[in-house]
Amino acid sequence: IVSYNEKVLQDIGKNKTLTVMLAGRPYHSDPLIQHKISDMISEMGVHVITDDLVRDKEVGIDDIHFVAQWAYTNRILKAAKWCATQGKEIQFIEMTSFGCGPDAFLVDEVREVLMRHNKSLTLLKLDDISNIGSMKLRVRSMIESLKLIDEHPAETPDIKDFVTVPIYDQTYRNRKILVPFFTPFMSPLIPSILKVAGYDVENLPLSNSESCEWGLKYANNEVCYPATLIVGDIIKAFKSKKYDPAKTAVAITQTGGQCRASNYISLIKKALIDAGYTDVPVISISFGGGIENNQPGFSVSWLKILPVAFYSILYSDCIAKFYYGSVVREKEKGISARLRDQYLELADRLADRKRRRSGSSDFIKLLHAEFCQSQGQCRGTCGEQAAIGSGSEWGIQDSKKADKQDQCDSSPIPLFRSVR
């Protein structure tokens, strides 16, 4: 396939006739899946080559935000970069079947690469087409417009430089770091965990409709919904004027594997650039070794932070189980949420003091007792468990031993097992 593409390229090189490079997923080579687009273009008098041409070529794709994790996406990016550096007689068409997935990140990157070299992207969404005639009309319109450009040549504009956010080095070390809101059980503990590592971290508020609006404006509209919210939360924070871009950085977790979430960082960088916040570095927080984000100023001693993080995760998981088990049975509306927030706020002291198992187990006994009392599902042991752990140490009033009859209900089985 590569040799055939090379031969076609040599044949058209002498006359510089109009040529279209077709790029897409491997299954788009099937004529039925691609609706015979290649035949359609050939019948219009235009040569067709495929992205297989660049398989053996050394084409650098360092000037992109995309995290290159998949073979076919890397090939499409290389093909777009190669096409962008060729003459105007070689143009680019990308085929996609659905936007959600890597394609949502990829399309924007391909468009940026071509636009920097003063070329445009023609994107054909094959699964959105119910009438082949409309696609044929669009392809013909593209080809005719390119022929008009050849007939009326104009001065070629300069190639634009690749613009990205700054590298997080020691000059940015003292900046406040904003992190998206992940979960009401773990997010409140994140600032304290990273404070142990020496970083000033602040959670962004929970997403709302305004987050959606900003996310749709600065992220691909077919990207997965959480990505839209995360991008929207970050842009909304800066648009609110609450944070100074010159004194702030942004952090996002990455899975380190072949997951769309690993590319959230590329979406955030691109959104910050498009919104005009070019001085805000973006930090990747990941345990995976396959993620490369140049950030020499961000260094964490995981041996120091992991014990605190580990017990914080277990603690937040216990609160989540207690909360979801209690909220539908609570005697007083809203008490489960208040207890959740109270014990998450108090847990910050565990991280500040670097308390581990002993402190977290005491807390779990206390919150177990209070959650049980909030719904009357206890056999008279709640008061005893609450007394264990000396709540006054954490600034909590010791739970009083309530009357056994008041603490119990008619159910023979407590909602939660006793914490040992």
Residue ranges and their predicted role:
Residues 1-420:
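An N-terminal assembly and electron-transfer interface module characteristic of large anaerobic redox
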